[in-house]
Amino acid sequence: MKLGVVGLPNVGKSTLFNAITHAGAQAANFPFCTIEPNVGIVAVPDERLDKLAALYSSKKITPATIEFVDIAGLVKGASRGEGLGNKFLSHIREVDAIVHVVRCFADDNVTHVENGVDPVRDISIINLELILADLESVTKRLDRAKSYIKTGDKKYKIESDLLQRIYDCLAEEKPVYSLEFNEEEQKYVNGLFLLTTKPVLYAANIGEEDIGKDESELPLVQKVKEYAQKEGNQVLVICAKVEEEISQLPAEDAQMFLEDLGLTESGLDRLVRTSYKLLGLISYLTAGETETRAWTITEGTKAPQAAGKIHSDFERGFIKADVVEYQTLLECGNYTKAKEAGKVRSEGKEYVMKDGDVVLFKFNV
């Protein structure tokens, strides 16, 4: 699963990405300093792993991960190929969700491509470019579907009607995710690879002087929240500059730095955790002397498909899953005691996995 980190030039996008991945993307004070997308694999914070590893005396801990892609900045007209528009659009098609960094700080030393700080205007610019790109794509498909209706095949009429709904939505400058589809329609829409079907998380990038303030005291943040609420999207408040500084520190120093700022966890941990949920992901856990590990699955995944994440043979020859809830296992003290207490369940092929399930799969191939 990939998240694309987007934003207008000089809003703090690359600075935030540096903090997320330690990848050192060049954060220079001029547009388009991020020419090719930088990719970083980030660990999903999960305190359960350390406790589980201690229980099993595991030699290795492997957390779940999520992939972030730093995508080159864009300006008005990106959908027509201006700026680095075409590159931006091709890269953003490949991600599953969007983290949209929005500037909510004033700094005379950092220019703004639109000559002034206005987060709602910035959001509107990018959203419009995505809508226009989708509109172009849908228009071509709609014209083709309409031309095939005369063949008498009903499927082209159904396709045309659905595309017309999508076209009308985009023509009103609304994203496709604002529409509701039945299961069959959703499959078709997924195959269109439209940009405005992707879930969005707004990262409101504040200045250092605003850290610790109540969000109600930050008018620019409030504007972003009001805009996002209308869309049904989330907002996460973060200071990219400080997060980048924290990311360069040893763990102990980073914790002290956070405490000095009056924070209990870094904004990055919140961002990664929120992004994981945004994608509808959960983790199940496996543990043993060799390794304790978190495995990423989509909510609603059944046991055989979850087993397939470990190895395809596990899914092909699935027999059952021995499952115990993480908290229950911790309370029992170890797996043997949990089993003796009747807390370990044997689940079959229809079992829907839950976040925090500690699992031992049985299979035969």
Report residues per predicted region:
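Short, intrinsically disordered, mixed-charge
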Residues: H22, A54, S90, L128, ...
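Short, flexible surface segments
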Residues: E94, K354-D355
